[in-house]
């Protein structure tokens, strides 16, 4: 094979002289693969252009009644605040399992439930923590460590507390009860919620609970704002301004509009107190 390799090299100068005349044909043929490579590169960029729709198709949020379910509202607002595209799956409120959750008869609340890229997350606070990790630019938790701890604490308090208010002032966006009489235990819950709001707005400057950025806490307390409207709860100026601000958020307005057009009623909740 060494001899064959030397044979072309040891040829006379006449062979190379003819080679250049034929050589252009070969380079021209060689240009064809280069063109194909450019074409394939252009095709490779196409999936990037449709990446947002792919992301949306791999994220789904399961909720139930928009009129009655405060937990569904919290999970939905968190997902909207995060900026994560998602499809919405709505379970009918007359489904036995979801009905039990809305009526506070379920031992565990599994709605809302977020599925994102194969990861299934339920429980509103778990969804909030997950969204904060996958969508950090949304800043669902404050950057400052002390503010972040405070945000988690009051979100947890909303998550596990205020049972008297929940049971006596259930969420019902289509209803309105002027001069609704609030019993003492529910009033204690309302007083505590207002104290939380005032402390946060005074500490972090407002207009939201932790400053200029909406956080997990705002999503957690948004359904309370709707309850205060439904049951005609009187608030001080600071708390009323915060309620008005939250009810004016585009995402909250979208939710309320959808709730008003929701066909299903739950007789146990859709009554005059």
Feature-to-residue mapping (PLM):
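GST-like domain detector, emphasizing the conserved glutathione-binding G-site
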Residues: 2-4, 8, 26, 36, ...
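Long, intrinsically disordered low-complexity tandem-repeat segments
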Residues: 17-26
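Basic polycationic patches enriched in arginine
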Residues: 28-31
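Conserved beta-strand edge residues that scaffold enzyme active sites
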Residues: 92-95, 242, 260
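Active-site-flanking alpha-helical
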Residues: 132, 224-225, 256
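GST-like fold's C-terminal all-alpha helical module
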Residues: 158, 162-250
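Acidic/histidine-enriched, glycine/proline-rich intrinsically disordered or flexible terminal extensions
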Residues: 259-273
């Amino acid at each position: 094979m060494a001899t064959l390799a030397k044979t072309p090299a040891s040829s006379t100068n006449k062979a190379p002289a003819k080679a250049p005349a034929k050589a252009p044909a070969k380079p021209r043929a060689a240009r064809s693969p280069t063109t194909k490579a450019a074409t394939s590169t252009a095709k490779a960029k196409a999936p990037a252009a449709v990446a947002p729709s792919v992301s949306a198709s791999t994220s789904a949020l399961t909720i139930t009644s928009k009129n009655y379910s405060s937990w569904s509202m919290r999970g939905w607002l968190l997902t909207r605040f995060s900026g994560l595209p998602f499809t919405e799956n709505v379970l009918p409120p007359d489904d036995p399992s979801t009905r039990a959750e809305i009526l506070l008869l379920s031992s565990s609340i599994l709605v809302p439930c977020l599925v994102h890229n194969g990861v299934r997350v339920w429980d509103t606070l778990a969804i909030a923590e997950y969204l904060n990790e996958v969508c950090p630019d949304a800043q669902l938790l404050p950057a400052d460590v002390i503010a972040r701890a405070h945000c988690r604490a009051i979100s947890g308090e909303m998550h596990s507390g205020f049972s008297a208010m929940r049971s006596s002032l259930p969420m019902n966006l289509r209803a309105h009860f002027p001069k609704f009489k609030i019993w003492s235990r529910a009033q204690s819950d309302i007083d505590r919620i207002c104290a939380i709001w005032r402390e946060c707005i005074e500490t972090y400057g407002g207009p939201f609970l932790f400053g200029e950025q909406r956080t997990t806490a705002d999503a957690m307390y948004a359904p309370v704002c709707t309850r205060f409207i439904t049951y005609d709860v009187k608030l001080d100026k600071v708390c009323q301004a915060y309620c008005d601000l939250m009810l004016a958020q585009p995402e909250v307005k979208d939710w309320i509009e959808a709730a008003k057009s929701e066909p299903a009623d739950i007789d146990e909740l859709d009554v005059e107190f």
